[in-house]
Amino acid sequence: NFVLKLTSSKATLEFKYLGYQDKTMKVTQKGNVDLGTIALSLDAKTLGDVVITSSIAVARKTPVAVTTLAPEFIEEKLGTQEFPEILKSTPGVYATKQGGAYGDSKINMRGFKSENIAVMVNGIPMNDMEWGGLYWSNWAGLSDVTRSMQTQRGLGASKVSAPSVGGSINIVTRTIDQKKGGSISYAMGNDGYNKLLFHVSTGMSKDGWALTLLGGKTWGDGYIQGTEFSAYNYFVNIAKRINDAHQISFTAFGSPQWHNQRSNKDGLSIKGWQAVKNYMGDKSPYRYNPTYGFGPNGERMSASHNEYHKPQLSLNHQW
């Protein structure tokens, strides 16, 4: 509801809203005028369907520089590393932990930053729609649900998100092909690193249904001062094989997390580096965090803190 006071008996009102067509109404009466309910028509240009298709390059057949990582390789080599670090051995890919905090890794491909690398999960672009990059801390649980991971180096085109000038990374998650069974695992590492994970799958039933559930928690103190972290991850996949030619699957996954950070932009002078070495004592000076300290009650605090949850829901029809 709104009330407008006009100095003239003639006026033109314009109504605009994102996703709807503009509407113009003229007022020519004197005194109080009731416009009633103002209805805007949908703008078909902005609300049209987006069809996303994806495919995996075939080694020795597709004319693209490509590297494919199988789930066995990821499980054996990843350990307590972050997901992007598994690509360190891939030609043309540079992966680093930046400030060293949980989930703050970044990837450069052929020298290009993440803004020019298309990252997709099941063919759906994950790049941020505003700045084009990607925060890997939002997808901390992807390593536990990945069926295969493929990097394609070289120019690519995208109508939806970031242009893949440097290349593209396509991550395919588990679906109806999972065997019946389950597992519970616990991992631990240095600096209080802990990871608890469970996984269960029904396999495909006689009537074509399959369900896969996965959940876990990762927490620890971090290698760098004041980089404590805690993250949960979940994955749900419900699939139905209608016949030999059609299959429908619903997937939901996410990773609510928080972690303290260390900025990698605040460099130290030579004098400052010497002071840090004296301050840290026998500990490695590489652990020093200038944004870390203690509160009035002795609690550990950090000036840089990140807390986020970016769930993804998708419905796929394969034929």
Regions found by a protein language model. Give the residues of each.
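A beta-strand signature from Gram-negative outer-membrane beta-barrel systems
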Residues: 140-185
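Extracytoplasmic loops and strand-loop junctions of Gram-negative outer membrane beta-barrel proteins
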Residues: 131-132, 151-153, 180-183, 217-221, ...
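Short, acidic, small-residue-rich periplasmic hinge/interaction motif at the N-terminus
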Residues: 14-21, 30-76, 114
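Extracytoplasmic beta-strand/coil segments of soluble accessory domains associated
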Residues: 59, 84-125, 141, 147
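Transmembrane beta-barrel wall of Gram-negative outer-membrane proteins
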Residues: 181, 188-219, 224-273, 304-318
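Short, glycine-/polar-rich solvent-exposed loops and beta-turns at beta-strand/coil boundaries
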Residues: 27-32, 93-103, 161-165, 227-230
